[in-house]
Amino acid sequence: MSGFTPASSSVVVTLTTALALAPTAAFAVDYLSADEAAKLMFPQADRFEPRTLAFDAEQLQRLQAAGVSPRSARWQVRVAQRDGATLGYVVVDDVIGKFELITYAVGIGSDGAVRQVEVLSYRESHGHEIRLPAWRRQFVGKDASAPLRVGEDIANISGATLSCSHVTEGIKRIVTVIDLARHAGSLA
């Protein structure tokens, strides 16, 4: 006798079904912490001062007029400093890929231009190519005046269209928020 019984076949079917229905979060990978990303983006910084930006109704309308959905009136920013001088800003954000959250950080210089983008956690089963340095480097030097649109100044990655689009939209939102805060004196 082979040892294969109707009961064991039921277990195989149950396990196969459970694996097929397992959430895509099983693919989650954490690459960097927010602190590690900040130090990577601004290695010369001797301090990262946490700041909360709080926008009023008029400022939120300005963000919407700039074509971004602010999602919140409050933003957490780490101000990178060396000897009291501001080097730039680090903002950590989450966007939905296809089904799961993507956590990323954007380093922005004191001039308002993107210095670096790092993916901190990626939870999708596909589209992890957005972590490739070549794709992330496309954002370097872009500021609030850049279109920041997939298919225009940002290349798409086949199989990662939603991840590319949503991270790009998030970065556009962040550079616009930082631009507004810089010009309002909120980061001085």
Annotate each PLM feature.
Residues 2-14:
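Bacterial N-terminal signal peptides that target proteins for export
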Residues 26-157, 161-165, 169-188:
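Flexible, solvent-exposed loop/hinge segments and secondary-structure transition points
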